[in-house]
Design a protein with these regions (language model features):
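N-terminal maturation segment of proteins
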Residues: 5-561
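Bacterial N-terminal signal peptides
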Residues: 1-3
Length: 561
């Protein structure tokens, strides 16, 4: 009898999950496009108070439906996907009832004003003739999104409004120039859409002026989330069993351990580069580490060589993974491309994988030459930061065996519902990529020079988590933040300035790298302890990434750890 009951519970859950996803994609058309469902490509999110109230009621209705199901009776993937959906709905309700970002954060609207258009241009999921009508429809919707933003926004934090001004300029450039690659493929349609293009750019110009002249002078909100909201948001965003206090405690301890490890890695290199150094200098941990990092920064690519170099490194890393038998390599294509102009100047590279509902797409490893308007000094500083060895470490993180490999494996996972595919865990995904950096360095990839960069990036991930919590649940000042980054974790000034800004604009996101990596390393240690000499690294890695991208706590459960 039990099985019959379980089956009805499974059927009931699958129906709820299917209905939930359907309404989610309908209410978030930009997300639908990104995920690879193109039924809503001509629509934008409705940010009106009525729509938001209706959306909250819908979430609560689905929460009640899930409460009627006995989760313990669910079989297979449904058992965990039920909990993932429940946690996600709770997060949505928390955002609607407590965070209320649409009322104070102008960056919320950029998803509709810029990203919605970019998504139609960036991926060749359909011929230009099919995508341009969606582009037209979305451009026609932009004035109503702007009207909603103007009506909703009160008490924005100043840094959010200033950033919205910059991003709106990016949206204007996108409408005027960034959509050209798509329009050039259909000359007649290009001609027809030109007046709308100009009108949309003018509407965005007007919005930018409103942000500068109206919202900015009254932007008196606090960028700090506050301890109570941060604790809740962190729990939802990370879906981790680690508490806020435990995360801070482990980050502080890890900071000291990693500072020691990077010094111990730097010391033999320092002696090689500076054979006449005296013992007092050799004992100065900070000086030795900084000098070696500085020396390694001298070997770097430039605008002309960066894309070619990245292609070589992808091949090198792939061969290393294969020859050391670390994890199964997928056969889905990876294209190394120059980064689109309007995305440049932030990170040097990112991995753009196809959405889980878009099974045919390629993965792009986008690599950035610097923006055209940068000075010679600024370009030099950027490429010193992203030097040859750092690009090798970054390629491990973004592509091989990091994001590209993991997401290709995740897209192979199938379950009765799409819950796990759509509500992927950023903590699992980022944690895997940071874990891969450490694993590759442990295996000797790139020698001590790459290990220096890996440990530097590890310090950066630790600092990210400390910043996130100290800023939003504490009162960390700009000076304290800059000291942590530049003195404790060897970051360049330009990078630290950008991170101080990002840490104020976002909350709970910067913790994902450290927490995810910590959970992955804890998981591996648990499996090593359990299996002893029978532990097989490749078998372990393949198993960890065989379940899609759920929170790490569920992978631990699935592996019986």
């Amino acid at each position: 009898m039990l099985n019959a009951f379980a089956t009805t519970q499974d059927d009931a859950f699958q129906k709820i999950a299917h209905d939930y996803i359907e309404q989610y994609l309908r209410a978030n058309p930009e997300d639908a496009t990104e995920l690879g469902d193109h039924r809503f490509d001509g629509q934008l999110t409705d940010y009106s108070p009525d729509a938001r109230a209706k959306e909250l009621a819908t979430q609560k209705e689905f929460r009640n439906k899930l409460n009627a199901i006995d989760g313990s009776q669910l079989t297979g993937a449904n058992n965990i996907d039920f909990r993932i959906l429940k946690e996600n709905i709770d997060y949505q309700i928390f955002q609607a009832e407590e965070l209320k970002q649409a009322e104070w954060n102008p960056l919320v609207y950029m998803q509709s004003l810029a990203n919605s258009l970019y998504l139609l241009v960036a991926r060749d999921f359909a011929p230009a003739e099919q995508r341009i009508p969606s582009l037209r429809q979305r451009m026609e919707e932009i004035p109503s999104v702007i009207a909603q933003a103007k009506a909703n926004l009160q008490h924005s934090p100043r840094v959010h409004t200033e950033t919205a001004v910059e991003q709106t300029q990016g949206a204007i450039n996108l409408v005027r120039e960034g959509v050209a690659p798509l329009l050039d493929r259909a000359p007649q349609m290009k001609k027809d859409i030109a007046p709308l293009q100009e009108k949309t750019a003018a509407t965005l110009e007007d919005y930018k002026k409103w942000l500068q002249n109206d919202l900015l002078p009254r932007s008196d909100g606090n960028f700090r989330l506050g301890a109570q909201k941060f604790r809740k948001k962190l729990r939802f965003a990370l879906a981790s069993d680690l508490s806020m206090e435990e995360i801070m405690k482990r980050a502080q301890a890890d900071l000291k351990q990693t500072q020691t490890a990077i010094y111990e890695t730097a010391l033999p290199l320092y002696k090689k580069y500076f054979p006449n150094a005296d013992s007092a200098t050799l004992a100065d941990k900070h000086k030795v580490t900084a000098a070696v990092l500085d020396k390694l920064a001298q070997q770097h690519p430039d605008d002309a060589t960066i894309v070619g170099y990245a292609k070589e490194v992808v091949t090198e890393a792939t061969n290393f993974v294969r020859s050391h038998s670390l994890v199964t390599i997928p056969d889905t294509p990876l294209d190394v491309i120059p980064m689109p102009e309007f995305k440049r100047g932030v990170a040097i590279a990112y991995c753009d994988s196809p959405g889980p509902l878009d099974k045919t797409g390629k993965t792009f490893f986008a690599v950035a030459p610097t923006p055209k308007d940068w000075s010679k000094e600024r370009k030099e500083s950027f490429f010193r930061e992203y030097n040859n060895d750092e690009i090798r470490d970054l390629t491990v993180h973004e592509a091989m065996p990091g994001h590209y490999l993991q997401i290709a494996h995740a897209n192979e996972f199938s379950a009765p519902t799409l819950i796990r595919a759509i509500f992927r865990s950023g903590t699992f995904i980022e944690g895997w990529a940071v874990y891969c950096e450490q694993m590759m360095a442990e295996q000797g990839y790139g020698g001590p020079e790459v290990k220096m960069q890996q440990l530097k990036m590890r310090l950066r991930a630790i600092a990210n988590a400390i910043l996130d919590q100290s800023i939003h649940a504490g009162n960390m000042t700009e000076k304290e933040a800059m000291d942590l980054m530049m003195k404790e974790t060897f970051q360049q000034e330009g990078e630290a300035v950008a991170k101080w800004k990002r840490a104020r604009l976002t909350s709970a996101q910067l913790s994902t790298y450290f927490v995810g990596a910590t959970e992955h390393l804890d998981l591996r240690a648990a499996q090593e302890k359990k299996l002893g000499k029978d532990f097989d690294l490749r078998k372990y890695n393949d198993q960890v990434i065989s379940y899609g991208s759920p929170p790490v706590k569920y992978v631990r459960e699935l592996m019986g750890l």
